[in-house]
UniProtKB/Swiss-Prot annotation:
Gene (name only): WBC30
Mode of membrane association: Multi-pass membrane protein
A Pfam family hit: ABC_tran
Record domain ABC transmembrane type-2: where: 832-1029
Residue stretches spanning the membrane: 12-32, 292-312, 853-873, 877-897, 958-978, 979-999, 1054-1074
UniProt organism field: Arabidopsis thaliana (Mouse-ear cress)
Family: Belongs to the ABC transporter superfamily. ABCG family. Eye pigment precursor importer (TC 3.A.1.204) subfamily.
Region (Disordered): 329-437
SUPFAM superfamilies, per database record: P-loop containing nucleoside triphosphate hydrolases
Protein's cellular compartments: Membrane
Any one GO CC term of the record: membrane
Protein name: Putative white-brown complex homolog protein 30
Residues covered by the ABC transporter domain: 484-726
Amino acid sequence: MRVRVDVCWTQHIFLFFVFGLSFMSFALSLDGDDYSKTGNPKALVSVTNLIYTRLQNLKTVLKADVDRDLGYCIKNLKGDWNEAFNFDKNLDFLSNCVKKNDGDLTLRLCSAAEIKFYFSSFVRRDEATTVHVKPNINCNLAKWVSGCEPGWSCNADDEKRFDLNNGKILPSRTRKCQPCCEGFFCPQGLACMIPCPLGAYCPLAKLNKTTGFCEPYNYQIPPGKLNHTCGSADSWVDAESSGDMFCSPGSYCPTTIRKVTCSSGHYCRQGSTSQKPCFKLATCNPNTANQNIHAYGAILIASLSLLMIMVYNCSDQVLATREKRQAKSREAAARHAKETTQARERWKTAKGVAKNQKMGLSAQLSQTFSRMKSARKDATPVKASGKSKDKKKEPSNLTKMMKSMEENPSNNEGFNVGTGSKPGKKPQAPKGKQLHTQSQIFKYAYGQIEKEKAMEQNNKNLTFSGVISMATDTEMRTRPVIEVAFKDLTLTLKGKHKHILRSVTGKIMPGRVSAVMGPSGAGKTTFLSALAGKATGCTRTGLILINGRNDSINSYKKITGFVPQDDVVHGNLTVEENLRFSARCRLSAYMSKADKVLIIERVIESLGLQHVRDSLVGTIEKRGISGGQRKRVNVGVEMVMEPSLLILDEPTTGLDSASSQLLLRALRREALEGVNICMVVHQPSYTMYKMFDDMIILAKGGLTVYHGSVKKIEEYFADIGITVPDRVNPPDHYIDILEGIVKPDGDITIEQLPVRWMLHNGYPVPHDMLKFCDGLPSSSTGSAQEDSTHNSFSNDLWQDVKTNVEITKDQLQHNYSNSHDNSNRVTPTVGRQYRYFVGRVGKQRLREARLQALDFLILLVAGACLGTLAKVNDETIDTLGYTYTIIAVSLLCKISALRSFSVDKLQYWRESAAGISSLAHFMAKDTMDHLNTIMKPLVYLSMFYFFNNPRSSFEDNYIVLVCLVYCVTGMAYIFAILYSPSAAQLLSVLVPVVMTLIANQDKESMVLKYLGSFCYPKWTLEAFVLSNAQRYSGVWVVTRCSSLSQNGYDLSDWILCLIVLVLMGLICRFIAYFCMVTFQKK
């Protein structure tokens, strides 16, 4: 941060150089006697012009000193000089003063030493804001001439030795003391004159006998001096201390000695040199200080609202039209495929009937005794047959197509459902990559589905892959096979040393549906999490082998599907949109669009979701599809990516029997294609029970009771003395026994069931479970002795801390684990996934238009309130009003930005665990939030700016607010990712207030000054003040320098402030992305 000199000292330096050096030229050129001796008006004009010309040449002399000492508040010396001392239009005040002083004007002007002494006195300032000059050679306790009074001045005593260039020695002044000229100001205690700047009104004061003040200034004539009268202005400092010198609001001062009231249709701010015309829709009466431009705010907000409504309606209409066209094309394709399939079936039936008739006729002819009789009998049927054949040929195109298919199954030219082309045009069915239009793609997809259905009916013993292969007549894409074997798998909670899964051995195989059952607390979900590589916070022992190799399951993440127990899907997307997004991001990047559509349509068909495919899934606040349909969508999200291993955590929970069977049939179709399916179920119905291939039953404590084929489960339990009563569902009976509701038959106990299974398969029995083996005495249990020692509280606390650190470390290692990819599947790149995410987030935002409109409405109200209440304060360059703006905009924009990442955390965790790009997810959300970054400053300023009407331009304010919103949005991302919604909202309210308070604290404290540099309100407020300060010139230049010096600002730092805000926003986004990846729960 730039180190500033004292506030007042800075002002002194500025005015010292401006006026001190300027009056050096007066001494070198002015000779007032030329006019006083002759009284010639031409001489007066020459003298006046000569003085003014010398004054204008000082810009070159002053440049180096101003750049060195006042560079923080004066960047354009020429421009600021002209704004303050360009008297080209009227030099009357100078001519009048030359005439009044009879040639001794030069002797009455302040020398360089006096100007320096005057401004150095500002270090001490009285509480009543009256400027006091320190005692000097002319004005002190022992000597006080009348020229020392405010508004008065005296001639220098020694005319010959008087030198305005002398900056060290104060000249003695005792002669010809009189009131100062109008257009000049004469400080109390100095006895010399300085010209007033443009924008000031410096007439001769008039005594108000009632108050005793010399109006319009705030000083009185000395008591007891009857001959003393009021003089001119007495000081020029900032607006707060010398506001009576400034041209009053509602008037303008073309010269420093003339004030004109603003006319109707114009407005004049304080310190104006000319009146400014009001805008057409603004109302400006005479003597108006600021124009009322509320109408333009209303027009702007109406335009923005209309634009947003148009964009929303048009985009919504485009989406609706696109969806309708898609649905129409899809329905037409489905109808076409069904009609074609039905026509094929009718042709097959007719052909079969004809063959049967021909075979019957041949048998009848073989039994005839007379050749003539047989000939007569044969003639009539042949004729009838010919007629029948002619009738069947009437629908010639369809008949030929069906006949061609039956005679040559390998030729698909007669059944080209993909394009609907006529027979004979193409010798081969079009593949997915050759299809481009939506109509062609849907015809291809539905044609394949209908053929698969027909093939499945005719070849019930064939696998689903075989059916697809026959239906497509192409080489079927084979999925990689995943077999998962586990040996002595044990999971132990860290810190508690409690087994949640113990000594589980077995395997789940491709092409089979394995069900995991057990009572509550048996570790079913933990078992699935261990298989899926998601178990953290525990110690794992034993082996998990993938296809016989000790590989991590994460190496097959791209072809592994995991369906969580909760329905983690996007409620503001339709069923089809949820499935389509998963398919796009997780299927092979080289797969054609038509094949992806075919896979999606297969899943929708198999899960029975056709009639709700275009319905929103729904959320807690907004109801959508039913719970059973939502559960099927939850499963379908994983099915569309064609997994080789599909793990489901209680997919049938909450479903009725029909929905459960529909879901399980869909899963069996996947298993027929070679998918390894493992799922947790709770007491399935007998029908569902028979649909499983393998069953894994766990007891409490994570011990295996049974793991094998469903066909052999009853036989096994019967062998150990557990038989299922009549009319009782076997799974229900086994669970009741494990829960302790039903006592098992015979002498066997629940604790012995896992040991019996281990002994049955020859697995080693843990030492502490040997007591449950049959025939062993209770004394030989070998159980470990209980630890009778008790740790102290501090030891327990330390152990808990260590455990939490280990669990956190384990979670971080899990999140950043990078296993070698063995799936042989190349998913879309980050760039392509980013496009998919942008499309998805765009749809979600359009469906949340009411929330967006509410955000804008709140911003409008805030802008109107703050614009009305926080009036422009020229004395402080409106610092306070901008402070309120920073707090309000930061708070409102942060709270609304929380929704970007706090609403769909669970969905992100699921997608990230499935291998979908986190970077694409984050960048797409941030990209769509840029619409708010652009629009919200416009919405707020449409009220605030036109109600407040500051001096700075609308464009400057908008740029600063855009950078501010970009910065605080990044901070909101961090809060949304790390904290719960309620905590994040509290932080979004607290942080702007605290940071603003820190940024506005006294800069003398180095700690607060250092902390303030890291607070975005400090840089935002500086940018606002600088954009406003640039508009203060002329008489305001000292106020500008004073305000910037007090706050430690520099005019050249405006761009720097914007860059810092943008950098803070970028850094916050990097931190937010890091937190999102690091602290996610996979």
